[in-house]
Amino acid sequence: MEGNLSFSLMEASGRSIFFLIEGIREQSIKNMFSRMFSWSFVVAACLAGLFPAQSQGEEKAAQSGTIAVKVPASSLLMTRQETGETRLDRSFSNAGLSIGGKKYATGIGTHATSMIPLPVPENPKVLRLEGACGIDDGADGDGSVEFRVMSGSEVLWSSGVMRRGMAAKKFSIPVAENGIRHLYLMADRVDNNSYDHADWVDLAWKTTGSGQGMKGAVVNASEFGMVPGVRKDQGPALRAAVSALRRQGGGVLNIPRGIYHFYPEGALNMSFHISNHDQPLIHPVCVPLADLRNVRVEGNGSLFLFHGKVVPLLVMDSENVSINRLSVDYERSWCTEARVVKTDDRFTEVEIDKKAYPYEIRNNRFVFQGKGWEEGMGSCMAFEKGTGHIIANTSDIGWNGHVEPLGGSRLRLSWNLRQKGIKPGDTLVLRNYNRPHPGCVVYRARKTSLNDVSLHQSSGMALLVQRSEDFHMKGGGVMVRKGTGRVHTAGADATHFSNTRGGIVVEKALFEGMMDDAINVHSTCLGVMEVVDSHTLKCKYMHRQAVGFEVFLPGEKIRFINGPTLEPGGTATVKTAVKKNSAEMVITVEEPLPSSVRAGDAVENADFYPSVVFRNNIVRNNRARGSLFTTPERVLVEGNLFDHSSGSAILLAGDAQGWYESGACHEVVIRKNTFINNLTSRYQFTNAIISIYPEVKQLDRQRDYYHRNVLIENNVFKTFDVPLLFAISTDNLKFINNKVIYNDEFKGWGQKPFQFRRCANILIKDNKVLPPRTWTLEDCKLENTPSDQVRFGG
């Protein structure tokens, strides 16, 4: 940029205005005066009264204004903390706040590593956050913590390393002039996490002006130093552009078409819980789109290439953010692909491109390597040469055996894969089950859209949306990037929606090569550990990969679930919720608890259920299931192609015993889809092409049905002999006007096409079957389902 001419308003008294001119570098007089002219107009306008100055009295009131920070209970529930409870006005050890021998009446007591989201009051006069921080005197040993105050895209202030006994360090953070609506208070451990009792004290909002920026202008990433086609880290430049968007209150971020590289070193280190993943303390976020409103990111067909263990994209605490025409990939994919060159009854010989997939052989075992990481092998998936289909009847192949280098790129594995039907030319995807980071996270966001966004790789879910409202994905999807020669994409689900509400729309996208579902929609329920009194429950996050995120907030309704039967037991309103640690919570409700609630039951959020439209997508060549839905709001699955998804194409689930993923389906329409040779392998809950499989411990005790109102109509099934429909605890189930064309491309299961376990009001009619046949009750397997509950026609 030619010259850097910046002005800051230092003082306003009546009509006197002083500007500080900083950093005037060599530039022509012409350029200098052209810039100064616009500022001269602003000054003249102020003097002329176009921008009225404050009166001295008004100015004095504004300068002296202070608002004590009232930390909402929701911020404590949203806090990620490595251990223990976050406390208001108390230390981590539940004593008074004290730093460097000085006592403080107000603040937050936490334990590093932690990150506290702090919303800014909706007041245009709030300009700064002031406060102090340090290690609490009550810690039993010498801790070491670095405190940071962050916006949604950059570190605004850092304390440096602090230790017990040091005086509190003060900070003053510009807020309004940066367009900030959320701040993030992070305490990060330095040496280890021993005695890292971290206090934030004397927090106050200072009210000295409005500091509002212009609205809606275009921000060009190139003006902030983003350069395509070089291997330099583009993260800092992009984050500076995002900060500019926030300052001006929204607008368009324009990224010139090109290839851009991102590394952990230039990422914004944040700490928060992500549903259905491992829980690393730090998520290095390369593209943080946090605390934004009314922002459109135009990628113009660019490719973002990421290196190392990072979160590529984050949309958090934002509203009306759209990302358009962008591709996301890792330079080193998270799985390693090996091409089979020879098989026999004892060994399998493969070739691995070591440049694309770095590895070492240690103690005759694989050690796969990437930037900043090493991992072993746990299992593999086998993909067929030419078609890219997962090879039939292979499912997950567990192995971590003897590896012998043969020279060049060839290796011999002590592994008989011939017996699995694997042939030379097929591809083995060598993997494990680690899920450190998703490819894209949407968290506490409203009205988010991805348009023609392609996610090519991820170690966990490609897209994870949690605690958010209204999401739209159109075009793009999760697919192999052309030219890479790969067959796999996401390490788990392509898209995953946990505890969301409003509407989810996913349409015209391609999903292929992922290690789990194309889409998975569910709530998370917590296990009831103890009924403390008539209004209070102790609850627990029950799966180690689904902990810590805010399932309930005060004012929201919870629904009780009978643990053994999954039957609903009424609702209540949350009065208070205290997170004791990342896995345990104490909930107090306004109304008396139902007398039937007891330990072993579960609770879910009755205010966070989404409707779903999954329409005109292609799902192919993936592990496990094509799609999974668990929500009582309307679900429409229409016009999709499910092509060789190796498990069920569609699963309706629900449980309170494993993942604790709940949300009984009350209206599901499955129509105008095409199903081609699904169920070539078997996985959990995949009992038919369409499998309705809630996990009910005591099905015979149920008085009601878990799922209801499922309509399956006008679909085409091109399939070998496998069950078409399996259902447990479902009422009002219709399979009508479908076309089923059988083939012999794979070995059939030899089972009945319809299987029902404690179901009611089933209608099967007007279906066309080739070769021709007429279905009768003989084609149904019935368990705890009276025969008069199944009708054919009428």
Curated annotation (Swiss-Prot):
Alphabetically ordered keywords of this record: Glycosidase, Hydrolase, Repeat, Signal
UniProt GO molecular function: alpha-galactosidase activity
One Pfam family this sequence matches: Beta-barrel_GLAA-B_II
Catalysed conversion reaction: Hydrolysis of terminal, non-reducing branched (1->3)-alpha-D-galactosidic residues, producing free D-galactose; Hydrolysis of terminal, non-reducing linear (1->3)-alpha-D-galactosidic residues, producing free D-galactose; Hydrolysis of terminal, non-reducing alpha-D-galactose residues in alpha-D-galactosides, including galactose oligosaccharides, galactomannans and galactolipids
Ranges occupied by PbH1 repeats: 468-499, 609-631, 632-654, 665-686, 707-728
Keyword Hydrolase: yes
Parts of the chain that traverse the membrane: none
Coiled-coil positions: none
Keyword Repeat: yes
InterPro entries, per database record: Beta-barrel_GLAA-B_II, Galactose-bd-like_sf, Glyco_hyd_98_carb-bd, NPCBM_sf, Pectin_lyas_fold, Pectin_lyase_fold/virulence
EC number(s) reported in the record: 3.2.1.n1, 3.2.1.n2, 3.2.1.22
Signal peptide positions on this chain: 1-57
Family, per entry: Belongs to the glycosyl hydrolase 110 family. B subfamily.
Role description: Alpha-galactosidase. Removes both branched alpha-1,3-linked galactose residues of blood group B antigens and linear alpha-1,3-linked galactose structures.
Protein name listed in UniProt: Alpha-1,3-galactosidase B
Source organism: Akkermansia muciniphila (strain ATCC BAA-835 / DSM 22959 / JCM 33894 / BCRC 81048 / CCUG 64013 / CIP 107961 / Muc)
